[in-house]
Amino acid sequence: MGVKNIERLIEERQKIEPINPAELTLEEKVVEIRRTTRVVEGGRRFSFSTLAVVGDRNGHVGFGHGKANEVPPSIAKAIADAKKHLIRVPLIEGTIPHDVIGKYESAVVLLKPARKGTGVVAGGPVRPVLELLGVTDILTKIIGRTTNPNNTVRAVFDALLQIRSPEQVAAIRGVDEEKIRKNYRIYASAPIVK
């Protein structure tokens, strides 16, 4: 089995559910800037690759990658690419509806819904993705053996693409939507027990 192509999965989702970035008020965050050096006859040539995330803090988020000989053009390319790879994720009261595990190469990311007041318990490249998505309460864990932000962000998007809304789950199972919705609220509105 080959490596998942997250960009292709996002493009397939956009065919079903198109998102126009011009209609959204998007915020941008740069996750990583890498400098690579190529040695040529006259010395060294530098190029920069940037990983950026965009989101509207209301259920829409995207990531992109850009390369250029200078930092500002690589950031601009990454942001433009991120706007092409936007997805919509169903949120319930500031958290995700259910547990999900995303995988990409050696990166494995676990996302779990959390009660109100927990905050975004995430580190590294996972935090900007979830903050720009609009998640206010979530528990995360990077399980895989990787420190590569590119793979980690793609693993987060693999997890986000697996999230289903209560309506979608009810339609798949052929059950009453209210029954599903009641189970989804276990995490979101349960009182904190001391």
From Swiss-Prot:
Report which residue ranges the record marks as coiled coil: none
Task: Write down the superkingdom of origin.
Answer: Bacteria
A single Gene Ontology CC annotation of this entry is: small ribosomal subunit
Keywords from UniProt, A to Z, are:
Ribonucleoprotein, Ribosomal protein, RNA-binding, rRNA-binding
For this UniProt entry, the molecular function terms from Gene Ontology, in alphabetical order, are: rRNA binding; structural constituent of ribosome
Domain S5 DRBM: where? 26-89
The function of this protein is: With S4 and S12 plays an important role in translational accuracy.
Domain remark in the UniProt entry: The N-terminal domain interacts with the head of the 30S subunit; the C-terminal domain interacts with the body and contacts protein S4. The interaction surface between S4 and S5 is involved in control of translational fidelity.
Quaternary structure? Answer: Part of the 30S ribosomal subunit. Contacts proteins S4 and S8.
Protein name as catalogued:
Small ribosomal subunit protein uS5
Q: Which organism is it from?
A: Persephonella marina (strain DSM 14350 / EX-H1)
Organism lineage string: Bacteria, Pseudomonadati, Aquificota, Aquificia, Aquificales
